[in-house]
Amino acid sequence: LEKMLMCPVPSIGFDLLFRTGVLEHIFPELVALYGVDYQNGKGHKDNFYHTLQVLDNLAGKSEKLMLRWSALLHDIAKPQTKRYEKGVGWTFHGHDAVGAAMVPGIFKNMRLPLDHKLKYVQKMVRLHLRPIALTQEEITDSALRRLLFEAGEDLEDLLLLCEADITSKNPEKVKKYLNNYERVRQLLFDLEGRDRIRNWQPPVDGIEIMQVFGMG
């Protein structure tokens, strides 16, 4: 699977395994994403092919294997969290947290490393909705700081994953979403820079300088 993940267009191999029935035996959690349910004439998107599109989008931006795993698993809990709410439509509340909790079991079954790489993928899956939420509300410094703290050094990878998650066929929507993410990215980096300056402490203070030079 990892050889397929690292291909320029990973969806080709996964789609072939799916159509031949092989994928169901080696990765049933991924196959469970396939299909569209309807209620009151409303259907949700096919999350299997959406996931493959996200993976392809990301493959065009990053060659990091574990980030590609994150793309493959970002919506893995949608079957378990799928609900139809009257007046709202299909929802997948909590699929980020439930998906993160599923990652260790999937890694164990796939005989993947259960170390910092696992933790990284869990983090990406758990946080993949957070930047989206920031674009839909008034952005406060406290909300930005929470995301900075939780994403840590993996912030740019998280934003790449979020941008890859845009699979709309409407060019205007894609442009709008990308602009929203760019705004969030800029606000995050501006805040990070301000906080770094605010929290920086000089190695010596003014009193010490005066004492050294006999100015006190």
Residue ranges and their predicted role:
Residues 7-14, 23-26, 63-64, 82, ...:
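Intrinsically disordered or highly flexible coil/loop and linker segments, enriched in small
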Residues 16-17, 54, 99, 125, ...:
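A residue-level signal for conserved active-site and pocket-lining positions in enzyme catalytic cores
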Residues 36-45, 52-56, 112-174:
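Histidine/acidic-rich helix-loop-helix segments that form or flank divalent-metal centers
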Residues 46, 95, 136, 150, ...:
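A generic short alpha-helical patch detector that favors 3-5-residue windows
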Residues 103-109, 167-216:
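Charged substrate- and nucleic-acid-binding regions of tRNA-handling and nucleotidyl-transfer enzymes
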